[in-house]
Curated annotation (Swiss-Prot):
Protein name: LexA repressor
GO biological process: DNA repair; DNA replication; negative regulation of DNA-templated transcription; proteolysis; SOS response
E.C. numbers: 3.4.21.88
InterPro entries: LexA, LexA-like, LexA/Signal_pep-like_sf, LexA_DNA-bd_dom, LexA_repressor, Peptidase_S24_LexA, Peptidase_S24_S26A/B/C, WH-like_DNA-bd_sf
Catalytic reactions on record: Hydrolysis of Ala-|-Gly bond in repressor LexA
A matching Pfam family: LexA_DNA_bind
DNA-binding stretch(es), residue numbering of this chain: 28-48
The keyword DNA-binding is assigned to this record: yes
Role summary: Represses a number of genes involved in the response to DNA damage (SOS response), including recA and lexA. In the presence of single-stranded DNA, RecA interacts with LexA causing an autocatalytic cleavage which disrupts the DNA-binding part of LexA, leading to derepression of the SOS regulon and eventually DNA repair.
Keywords, alphabetical: Autocatalytic cleavage, DNA damage, DNA repair, DNA replication, DNA-binding, Hydrolase, Repressor, SOS response, Transcription, Transcription regulation
Annotated active site: 123, 160
Subunit structure of this chain's protein: Homodimer.
Organismal lineage: Bacteria, Pseudomonadati, Pseudomonadota, Gammaproteobacteria, Alteromonadales
């Protein structure tokens, strides 16, 4: 990878930090505001330069269409495990759920990722989490309102934005075609499996 200018390194760190804190990349306008650019167009030029250097991928058609690329080196049992279908009642990292391992440095995400989860469906497409993507997940058991989480609701695993109000939890999609999932903790089971800390495109080359 070609060396980055100080400004490019600053933007790349901002992208990683925003994903760690909110579960999604920043918009061009947010980058411009935080780093003092006069316009979102200035941020766009820096993003294009980062994309040319292989540091990010830009997905057209969405304001948050920024992804962190990665390449698979082999399928040995090292690196980050890719979780496929999750059986009811089983821990998400149970060996039988692991499809393969990717040679991904967990520290490229902030906080560090513990596993990858294959995205199914388009309920989070408005923040750039698309069908077939690999979602980098930092394993935790608790979440704050507004964070994008991997949650298990009565043994169904889903990726949604978390909101808790008293004894009720709402899991919000980022797609207007989907209604929130309402969970009443007084009689329903909900487990936080982790926080979304990054998205990797699941292309044929990966």
């Amino acid at each position: 990878m070609r060396p980055l200018t100080p400004r490019q390194a600053e933007i790349l760190e901002l992208i990683k930090r925003n994903i760690a804190e909110t579960g999604m990349p920043p918009t061009r306008a947010e980058i411009a505001t935080r780093l003092g650019f006069k316009s979102a167009n200035a941020a766009e030029e820096h993003l294009k330069a980062l994309a040319k250097k292989g540091c990010i991928e830009i997905m057209p058609g969405t304001s948050r269409g920024i992804r962190l690329p990665v390449e698979e080196e082999d399928n040995s049992e090292s690196g980050l495990p890719l979780i496929g279908q999750v059986a009811a009642g089983e821990p998400i990292l149970a060996q039988e759920h692991v499809e393969q391992y990717y040679q991904v440095d967990p520290s490229m995400f902030h906080p560090a990722a513990n596993f990858l989860l294959r995205v199914r469906g388009d309920s989070m497409k408005n923040i750039g989490i698309l069908e077939g993507d690999l979602l980098a997940v930092h394993k935790v058991q608790q979440a704050r309102n507004g964070q994008v989480v991997v949650a298990r609701v009565d043994d169904d695993v889903t990726v949604k934005r978390f909101e808790k109000k008293g004894n009720l939890v709402y899991l919000h999609a980022e797609n207007e075609d989907y209604s929130p999932i309402k969970v009443d903790l007084s009689f329903q089971s909900l487990t936080i499996e982790g926080l979304a800390v990054g998205v990797i495109r699941n292309g044929d080359w990966l």
